[in-house]
């Protein structure tokens, strides 16, 4: 296996949590384990295919755990792994920056921010 080279450490971070949806998924999982259908309901714009792909990548990188119950119909939950919890301060900082940005751009962020437990 060829060892990958990075120019700066943030490249490694973005390789794991970069993209449009991964941080959103992780923010939702900081509020507890979720089923795929719950995550889809919380992010109605994401396609099922993209959600599944992002969850698989986060699981492969050790950021989330997939908990599968052996029953019919199958029951699967996702939760942050211990390693994933190490991203909590980063996620909190991203949310705080987003609040500041929305206020700067729109004045009243409530006019553009959907109601959610994450936005309280």
List each model region and its residues.
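N-terminal helix-turn-helix DNA-binding core of bacterial DNA-binding proteins
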Residues: 5-50, 71-77
């Amino acid at each position: 296996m060829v060892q990958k080279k990075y120019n700066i450490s943030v490249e490694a971070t973005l390789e794991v949590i970069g993209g449009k949806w991964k941080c959103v998924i992780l923010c939702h999982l900081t509020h507890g384990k979720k089923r795929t259908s719950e995550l889809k309901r919380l992010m109605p714009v994401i396609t099922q295919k993209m959600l599944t792909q992002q969850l698989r990548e986060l699981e492969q990188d050790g950021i989330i755990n997939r908990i599968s119950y052996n029953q019919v119909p199958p029951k699967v939950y996702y939760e942050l792994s211990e390693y994933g919890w190490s991203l909590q301060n980063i996620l909190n900082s991203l949310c705080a920056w987003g609040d500041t940005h929305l206020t700067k751009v729109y004045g009243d962020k409530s006019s553009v921010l959907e109601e959610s437990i994450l936005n309280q």
